[in-house]
Amino acid sequence: MARQSFKRRKFCRFTAEKIQEVDYKQVDLLKDFISENGKIIPARITGTKAFYQRQLAVAVKRARFLALLPYTDQHK
């Protein structure tokens, strides 16, 4: 049996919105790229280009260090 899967076209949100640089102070933007557990979602899932994925990782790590974002989930 052949397995059919629907693949949606992935696009880089940063190039679509013409964002030049990812900043750690944009917490609402960063939350879109973090899973429920607090992990950074990989580029193969989000469709982000490698250049922006590196900036995103650095920005998330800085925001975590400054307590703008949590390191893990809420542990409910």
From Swiss-Prot:
Domain of life: Bacteria
Gene3D superfamilies reported in the protein's UniProt record: Ribosomal protein S18
InterPro entries: Ribosomal_bS18 (IPR001648), Ribosomal_bS18_CS (IPR018275), Ribosomal_bS18_sf (IPR036870)
GO BP: translation
GO cellular component labels: cytosolic small ribosomal subunit
Pfam families (UniProt xref): Ribosomal_S18
Any one GO molecular-function label of the UniProt entry: structural constituent of ribosome
Function: Binds as a heterodimer with protein bS6 to the central domain of the 16S rRNA, where it helps stabilize the platform of the 30S subunit.
Protein name: Small ribosomal subunit protein bS18
Organism name: Neisseria meningitidis serogroup B (strain ATCC BAA-335 / MC58)
UniProt gene name: rpsR
